[in-house]
Swiss-Prot record:
Alphabetical UniProt keywords: Bacterial flagellum, Periplasm, Signal
Protein name (database record): Flagellar P-ring protein
Organism lineage: Bacteria, Pseudomonadati, Pseudomonadota, Gammaproteobacteria, Enterobacterales
Single Gene Ontology BP annotation: bacterial-type flagellum-dependent cell motility
Signal peptide: 1-19
InterPro entries given in the database record: Flag_FlgI
Subunit structure: The basal body constitutes a major portion of the flagellar organelle and consists of four rings (L,P,S, and M) mounted on a central rod.
Cell location: Periplasm; Bacterial flagellum basal body
Provenance organism: Shigella flexneri serotype 5b (strain 8401)
Domain of life: Bacteria
Length: 365
């Protein structure tokens, strides 16, 4: 019986403390991506490009490109083009990116083009914040949306004014790296946590020797490494595969006010409370009343007068009891029992936190 209880306690402890690799919890300070941006032209559109009379920068860009290719456009020429669009091109330069390596680019219309489907991005230099060209982008655009229009009716699925080119840019310039310089580097936690930072430092010290790692704060752990690139690569490879017991994270509820989505982690709990939620609906009806003269040849005029009716209804919500819930499943059941919409649920969660019934951090994005 004692052995059974000991095994059960050990099982519960190992289940509560989940082991994770250090590489999944941290990143190396200084090893990061860098944003690139460029301005270019997309050609080959099927009549869905910019209306050049309303987007003069498209025509100006096209004239500059043609002049660089040795083609002179007569002054005052009004080019009515529908298969060209001005776009912004963005990409991320990966850490340790080498010359000749390809990266993905995102192409977004900046004019009034209807769609970029079927278009080809012409050679576009991508620059960093230092105005240096780090990559050149060119290729056929893949647009995930779809749309059609006929007879004054149209239908559209997803976004047509943006697309992606897989491996659409070639790196032409490398960023200087400080990796391998010095005898220390910092590991940055993905989420600030004092206990996790100390656990990682203790784990490294147990394997590599005391003094190998020091927790600087809730985000950074300083690690002593051997000098030289190859030695540091091997050292980091060993450290990143070490296992650390992950402590329960902070209870948090994230609300997206634009989409109405609500996401919560498993640490969220509720205390007993009572909730009443009323719904307010506004209905606007507008009709056109036509008044015509009684005599057809009396010289009167037909008059159209709009008539608008506004109906305001508010349904009173009954007071409902929400029981104390200690697990995520019980929290979900308790909130679903209220029968509230996602928009109402956001207000309810905010009120619960103000009343001290929601045991979690509330974050609105």
């Amino acid at each position: 019986m004692i052995k059974f209880l000991s095994a059960l306690i050990l099982l519960l402890v190992t289940t509560a403390a989940q082991a994770e690799r250090i590489r999944d919890l941290t990143s190396v300070q200084g090893v990061r991506q860098n944003s690139l941006i460029g301005y270019g032209l997309v050609v080959g559109l099927d009549g869905t490009g910019d209306q050049t009379t309303q987007t003069p920068f498209t025509t100006q860009t096209l004239n500059n490109m043609l002049s660089q290719l040795g083609i002179t456009v007569p002054t005052g020429t009004n080019m009515q083009l529908k298969n060209v669009a001005a776009v912004m091109v963005t990409a991320s330069l990966p850490p340790f990116g080498r010359q000749g390596q390809t990266i993905d680019v995102v192409v977004s219309s900046m004019g009034n083009a209807k769609s970029l489907r079927g278009g080809t991005l012409l050679m576009t230099p991508l620059k960093g914040v230092d105005s240096q060209v780090y990559a050149l982008a060119q290729g056929n655009i893949l647009v995930g949306g779809a749309g059609a229009s006929a007879g004054g009716s149209s239908v559209q699925v997803n976004q047509l004014n943006g697309g992606r080119i897989t491996n659409g840019a070639v790196i032409e310039r490398e960023l200087p790296s400080q990796f391998g310089v010095g005898n220390t580097l910092n590991l940055q936690l993905n989420d600030e946590d004092f206990s996790m930072a100390q656990q990682i430092a203790d784990t490294i010290n147990r394997v590599r020797g005391y003094g190998s790692a020091t927790a600087l704060d809730a985000r950074a752990i300083q690690v002593r490494v051997p000098s030289g690139n190859s030695s540091q690569v091997r050292f980091l490879a060993d450290i990143q595969n070490m296992q650390v017991n992950v402590t329960p994270q902070d209870a948090k509820v994230v609300i997206n006010s634009r989409t109405g989505s609500v996401v919560m982690n498993r640490e969220v709990t509720l205390d007993s409370c009572a909730v009443a939620q009323g719904n307010l609906s506004v209905t606007v009806n507008r009709q056109a009343n036509v008044s015509q003269p009684d005599t057809p040849f009396g010289g009167g005029q037909t008059v159209v007068t709009p008539q608008t009716q506004i109906d305001l209804r508010q349904s009173g919500g009954s007071l409902q009891s929400v029981r104390s819930s200690a697990s995520l499943n019980n929290v979900v059941r308790a909130l679903n029992a209220l029968g509230a919409t996602p928009i109402d649920l956001m207000s309810i969660l905010q009120s619960m936190q103000s009343a001290g019934c929601l045991r979690a951090k509330l974050e609105i994005i």
